[in-house]
UniProtKB/Swiss-Prot annotation:
Record has Transferase as a keyword: no
Originating organism: Borreliella burgdorferi (strain ATCC 35210 / DSM 4680 / CIP 102532 / B31) (Borrelia burgdorferi)
Protein name as catalogued: Flagellar biosynthesis protein FlhA
Entry's localization field: Cell membrane
Protein's GO biological process: bacterial-type flagellum assembly; protein secretion
Family statement drawn from the similarity comment of this UniProt entry: Belongs to the FHIPEP (flagella/HR/invasion proteins export pore) family.
Database matches in InterPro entries: FHIPEP_1, FHIPEP_3, FHIPEP_4, FHIPEP_CS, FlhA, T3SS_FHIPEP
Gene of this entry: flhA
Domain of life of the native organism: Bacteria
UniProt-listed Gene3D superfamilies: FHIPEP family, domain 1, FHIPEP family, domain 3, FHIPEP family, domain 4
Main location: membrane
Length: 697
């Protein structure tokens, strides 16, 4: 926005893309002023420019709502300091060389008219004014601004880690978008850099004040020396000419310096606000209108005391009373308008035109009871919020999907220690936490550890809630012990993995295609020629539903493209994509010897499963006899438990045709069962058959 405004102004002046050139040329001329003598007319112009720029600077500071709105200020301080020194050197050269014939109007005017008197009296008055300005600048404004800049720089740097963590927490909880978080971090870094620069730049201001005073003293002595010894003037003539011009030069150079010093003090003491400095003054001075009536009454009281200026005090008293009356009327009008607006808003709640059937739901949300609010408190370091950031990153790396923002809200309807994880407004998992305690996972009944017996919310394993003493005992016995944030984070991770296929939307697929197209345009073009985004989404969802990562999109899209001319059967394409990433799938279930231990099915029963396949456009079901299905589930469940008891991970290996039907049949009773087809196993992997499921017809 600022760049557009700058370009429009420069474009109007015919100086597009030449701002840097203009500043560079200006700085060269400034440096040249150290060497080249300037005519009095040019000196008057430059003195006026110095005064105008200083006035612009203080006005910009007053109208800025925050320090970063004028972030170039520290650099500008250095430039203006150099510019002022150049003017001092040039004016000194002209005064000493021209003497009586010096015709610089700005310096002569400040030496006579501004002082208000001429002769020796004017010199004394001018020098006193000069000393007062120097004292105010150095002792009051500059010293205070320097100290404030030092403290602000230190505090800004100390607060940086905490503010960055607060931004990360707000982003991970869904209160900030990625763009907003990035912008706030950039603003935070800019703020630290600004106050760090101001800490050093404030030294320019104090140094400039000291140098200004020193230059004036040197000019007075030098002027008297040149006038008396070189030009033959007596002391009074030299005093009237050289000292008068030197005082005028000192005043005309210290006025811009005073404005810049004041600007420095203002900008380092400003806090972030919605209004400018003037707006803040007005708002805060009108918060308490009763004080104006008190001041008015006090002035009226003073007006009747002997010796006080009665008319002036009465005029001021009436003016302040009128101001208080006017502000009261404005305040009453604002309150009436505010009340009417509130009534309109309340009425609009019941208005049909504001009722919309489309209410956006959070893709993912974690709702917590009020006792769990401290573990997500972003005013201090929150382990859970940090974990959420890591969860999103890890799942993106493991499964190849972008997990949307997880919004964290407190829900008074939940039990105080409960939490609920929701997917688009529907609960997919919940648990209960005991703050101050730890959960010992997978303990036996006779473990010898005292605690409350519960089930682990993530995997359903028998667990115990224990205190610190029980934690130490459990760790010595070799049990896994986790704290409350870890419990919630682990549960959320498993729920997101389990429902990753539901999280993936068409828009996510389209965004992936847009990014993927930049490097693999040929594949994307070939796939989109025959498949819609929705069909591609269904293939990817079919893979995610069985915990198959879709990070290897190149292989997956190439597989889809290979079969575009053969079929558009989604279930067939899912199987072919599984086979194309078979090495990836198999690697997750190999034992320490890189061998695959599996459970197989009786061939005749497997054929029955294949024959029971019923396929529609959007679903795949089995028409197998319910009694046979029950027997099969029973036998399979028994074998799975036996295999697990022997220390193996249960994996069912079947043919390509039966694999998806077996998964459909077992998805409700054994949802986490891994079912692979023979074609998914690489040829160099040794397969060991542990058990075979036999089902009697």
């Amino acid at each position: 926005m600022l760049d557009a405004r700058k370009n429009s102004i420069l474009g109007y002046l015919g100086l597009n893309n030449k701002s840097d050139l203009i500043i560079s040329v200006g700085l060269i001329f400034v440096v040249a002023g150290f060497i080249l003598p300037l005519p009095a007319v040019i000196l008057d112009v430059l003195i006026t420019v110095n005064l105008v720029i200083s006035l612009l600077i203080i006005l910009i500071v007053l109208y800025s709502k925050r320090s970063l709105d004028f972030s170039v200020f520290p650099t500008l301080l250095l430039v203006m300091t150099i510019f002022g020194l150049v003017l001092n050197i040039s004016s000194t050269r002209l005064i000493l060389t021209k003497g009586i014939n010096f015709d610089g109007q700005m310096i002569r005017t400040f030496g006579t008219f501004v002082v208000g008197s001429s002769g020796i009296q004017g010199l004394v008055i001018g020098f006193i004014i000069f000393i007062i300005i120097i004292a105010v600048q150095f002792i009051v404004i500059t010293k205070g601004a320097t100290r404030v800049a030092e403290v602000a720089a230190r505090f800004a740097l100390d607060a940086l880690p905490g503010k960055q963590m607060a931004i990360d927490s707000a982003y991970s909880s869904g209160n900030l978008t990625e763009e907003e978080a990035t912008r706030q971090k950039n603003d935070l870094q800019s703020e630290v850099n600004f106050y760090g620069a101001m800490d050093g730049a404030s030294k320019f201001v104090s140094g400039n004040v000291k140098v200004g005073f020193l230059i004036t003293l040197i000019n007075i002595l030098g002027g008297l020396l040149v006038g008396i010894t070189l030009q033959g003037l007596n002391f009074n003539e030299a005093l009237n000419n050289y000292v008068s011009l030197t005082v005028g030069d000192g005043l005309v150079s210290q006025l811009p310096s005073l404005l810049i010093s004041t600007s420095t003090g203002l900008i380092v003491t400003r806090s972030i606000s919605k209004n400018s400095f003037g707006g803040e003054i007005f708002d805060q001075f009108t918060n308490h209108l009763g004080i104006y009536w008190i001041v008015s009454g006090f002035l009226l009281f003073l007006a009747f005391l002997p010796g006080f200026p009665t008319l002036i005090l009465m005029f001021l008293s009436l003016s302040i009373a009128f101001l208080a009356y006017s502000l009261s009327g404005i305040r009453q009008k604002e309150e009436i308008d505010k009340k009417m607006k509130l009534e309109e808003e309340q009425a609009s709640i019941y208005s049909d035109k504001d009722v919309s059937p489309v209410v956006p739901l959070d893709p993912l949300a974690l709702e917590i009871g009020y006792n769990l609010v401290p573990i997500v408190d972003d005013t201090k370091t929150s382990e859970l919020l940090d974990r959420i950031v890591k969860i999103r990153r890890e799942i993106a790396f493991e499964f190849g999907i972008v997990v949307p923002k997880i919004r964290i809200v407190d829900n008074m309807r939940l039990e105080p220690n409960a939490y609920s994880f929701k997917l688009r407004g529907v609960e997919v998992g919940r648990g209960e936490i005991k703050l101050g305690k730890f959960l010992v996972i997978n303990v036996g009944i006779d473990s010898g550890i005292d605690g409350d017996l519960v089930k682990d919310p993530s995997f359903g394993l028998p667990s115990l809630w224990v205190n610190d003493d029980g934690r130490e005992t459990a760790e010595k016995l070799g049990y896994t012990v986790v704290d409350p944030p870890s419990i919630i984070a682990t549960h959320m991770t498993e729920l997101i993995k389990r429902h990753s296929y539901e999280i993936l939307t068409r828009q996510d697929v389209q965004n992936t295609l847009d990014v993927f197209k930049k490097d693999y345009g040929a594949i994307v073009e070939e796939v989109l020629k025959n498949f819609s985004v929705g069909e591609i989404q269904r293939v990817l969802q079919g893979l995610l539903k069985e915990q198959v990562s879709i990070r290897n999109l190149v292989t997956i899209f190439e597989t889809i493209a290979d079969f575009t001319s053969i079929t558009k059967d989604i279930f067939f394409l899912i199987e072919k994509c599984r086979q194309s990433v078979g090495r990836q799938i198999t690697s997750g279930y190999l034992d320490l010897n890189s061998e695959l231990n599996v459970i197989t099915l009786n061939p005749s029963f497997e054929q029955m499963i294949i024959d029971s396949r019923v396929e529609s456009n959007h679903d795949l079901i089995s028409s197998i006899d319910p009694n046979l299905k029950t027997k099969f589930i029973y036998e399979l469940f028994k074998i799975v438990n036996e295999v697990q008891a022997e220390g193996f991970y249960p994996v069912v290996l079947s043919s390509e045709s039966s694999r998806p039907i077996i998964k459909v049949i077992t998805s409700r009773e054994i949802p986490d069962l891994v079912v692979m087809s023979v074609l998914e196993v690489p040829q160099n992997i040794k397969v060991n058959v542990l058990k075979t499921v036999e089902v009697e017809e």
